[in-house]
């Protein structure tokens, strides 16, 4: 069977796990799932292999802090596959680092909290994309997706979070400009507030919802829609409306009003570019001590 070949980073938990699971289990793809936690990846692979799906998870233990290890992974992939259809950059260490410091200004946080949002998140996405780009350029096709957040548009948790997410949004935009002549797309996905192994936002989206959003872009979006979204940010909830999918409970977790509010915000000049824009008030943001309750699982993981 000619399965589509995909790579999903950060696939041991959270959005990455949900995306890898849906691609393999619901879409029948062969997914090279990367993370540091090999045991969690093996559990994911077993879940797919024991289902009635034709898809496959290939567990790939990988520390994306190690550039040479990433190069070795890409080279190994290329010896096994003659093409890559999809790269999803989902690995992110920031929330685990941020959780113990909710409510603090940036100067009271360790520098390592800032680094966590940029190293495994922004930088790791750039490195992985740069190493897979030649393969996509050569085959004149492929899709790169960065998993980001509305925190790239509006102040949420802290300075590092915003800088990292804004960087991911811009990463897709600038990569798309250079990849466009070669038939390769780069798009940023914004999930809504989520319920994962780390986070527990009320009525939040599950990682399966993001998985279905990614699958829609891979298997359902036509060339016109991909060109419209190329280099842009799209919300998972917007894709759910376009391609008629729901979360695992049969619901649309992020409502139409919230989705529209976020889209309006994304369509307006960012505060740094508008002299008329008011600065955000951190006391009314998610940078508050009580917000740590939304990260109950953070204590179970290391950055």
Please identify what each model-predicted range represents.
Residues 129-130, 173:
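A short, exposed helix-loop element centered on a Lys and neighboring polar residues
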Residues 93-94, 105-113, 117, 143-173, ...:
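Catalytic loop of short-chain dehydrogenase/reductase
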